[in-house]
Amino acid sequence: MDMKDHGVSEHVDPLMEDIDRYGLYKHVVELEAYGITVVPPETMRVDEEFVGRLRNAILRACERRNGVEITDYQTSVLAREDAGRNSWDLLEEDEIFVDAAINPVNLALVRWLLGGSAVFSGQTWIIKGEGYPSLNLHSDAHGIPPGGGHIAHTCNASWLCSDYEDAADGPTVFVPGSHHHARATLPHEEDLATTPFK
């Protein structure tokens, strides 16, 4: 028996149909358990060509906005300030950014976390070069006061456009389950060398 087929909730039933249609049950469970999931391109219903177009659009936008040249995304060296400067508001740069933002699989997971009234509030790139210093642990849920409740107020939905397999690739550090704390990172938890999260 599928609950969604019985009109149980007018707001949840369509979302459950999307979760079923796109085969996202595993990813929903990972979001609930760990606070993160990695959805492969085939599940996102995109191919390597789409990912390449998205990556190239990011690189061209960075070049135009910052007056730099990125000849090869795997070997070019960029100063940190050039890689991250002017990185916001990408939708008007290239249609591929709109396609990535409204990808139905992506939206199904965002709506799972935030509800049907989720609002798209920002888009940016993150370009990491070799030797860039690490960021401290932090929360991207800016402006949410302590005691904001055990609900998701915000989420990040990122497209990975290059290899992201180990520390050499400059990965994002994530604390599994930290979303259950319902608070931002505390000062004594921020430093990667001394954080109690291991």
Predicted feature residues:
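Non-heme Fe(II)-dependent double-stranded beta-helix
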Residues: 2-34, 39-144
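A short beta-loop-beta micro-motif enriched in histidine and acidic residues
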Residues: 142-154, 192-198
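Double-stranded beta-helix
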Residues: 164-198
